[in-house]
Amino acid sequence: MAATLTPEQITEYKGIFEMFDEEGNGLVKTDDLESLMSLVGINPTKRDLANMAKDVDKDKKGTFNCDGFLALMGIYHEKSKNQDEELRAAFKVFDKEHKGYIEWDTLKYVLMNAGEPLNEQEAELMMKEADKDGDGTIDYEEFVAMMTGESFKLTQ
């Protein structure tokens, strides 16, 4: 699975892994996984962290090796890529004229009528929070932040 990582990412992640390999034996304590992940800019939920720990510590010894960590990072990057593709597709549905942004009225209509509909006040509050630059439209970065609850930088 590490095949989805670039050589630069592999080098970076190996270096970070080695920082946590206190005994120099090629192993890192599963308890250090959260710190390791946050150092690479990933802040998983407690539940996701528990699942990640199970994935890398198959023999339940409380440690994992670099290959396991690289596999985990490969899976993470693959999921991120898939999420990005899904979000781009959703954005295109709303940006029918390919302007690069979603009109306030279009988004408000969707928020009030699709999925778990919001009332008008909730929809407007969500859009105000999402419209970081205050221009009355939602661009792709703002859309992703709104949908994922985090800021997102385009990876191009």
Curated annotation (Swiss-Prot):
Pfam families under this entry? EF-hand_7
What keywords tag this UniProt record? Calcium, Cytoplasm, Metal-binding, Repeat
- What InterPro entries does this protein's entry cite? CALM/Myosin/TropC-like, EF-hand-dom_pair, EF_Hand_1_Ca_BS, EF_hand_dom
Instruction: Please state every residue range assigned to the domain named EF-hand.
Output: 8-43, 44-79, 82-117, 118-153
The signal peptide annotation in the UniProt record is none
This protein's superkingdom? Eukaryota
SUPFAM superfamilies to which the protein is assigned, alphabetical: EF-hand (SSF47473)
Q: What is this protein's function?
A: May be involved in the cellular control mechanism of the secretion of toxins from the gland into the venom.
Specify the protein name: Calglandulin
